Amino acid sequence: GTYALYSDDTEVILTATRNGLSNDSENPADWNGEANATKKDGPQVTYYRSLIYATPSPYGKELAAKVNAGEKLTWEDLDKATWAVQKTSSSAGYIYPTLWLMENYDGKKISDLSNVVPLDSGYGTAFSYAAAEQVDIIVCYADGRNDYEASWTLPVDQKDETGKQGMGRSESIWNELNVIGVTDGIYNDTVAISKESPYYTPELIDALQQCFINIINTDEGQAIFSVYSHTGYAIAKDSDYDGARAALEVVS
């Protein structure tokens, strides 16, 4: 959102890329089931998404069954559910799920839902609430299930190799935690220039873009930019960040 905030004075020329996922479908049903388990082996991408998940609670299963049958959920369906969300400043955990609601349900927001549990302790808490069936819906970056796949089925008195506490479920997270909504892309970091400077000619901008792309495609460049977790750069345009501008409106 930083570029969107200052885009009156700056011009984006590049977007950082990251390793993408095997799935980028906008159809939530395409994300569900063991056969559709997401892998971290996709192409380089300039954005990531947030996903809205139905938990294995009795009502969460009802929501998942509707989506997997090709039905569109109504506002009443969603409003009946208990949601766990992250802080209001979280892009994947609050802002973009709010935008998803606004776009699909006549401007309704998370703040309009009847049953919302705000979480201050991160996504791990959301997944533990889901596993315990304490809530019906959680929201998280795509695809958070990768990071909790092992701990989901571990006994609660054990930890996985990354230190995550077991959640005691018996079925695969891919079968039990179903995607019911997919947000628009949340764009990555930018390389931007000042609109005020007279030095940025089209020729110089082209040269800068190619320079960054060439550098990061070397081993030395990867090492330099690893501090920012950037693995590549792609040429960007201002309209890529329209969603980020809409997000600013949500939190303003």
Where does each model-flagged region fall?
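Short beta-strand and adjacent tight-turn residues that come in two discontinuous sequence segments
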Residues: I13-T15, V139-C140
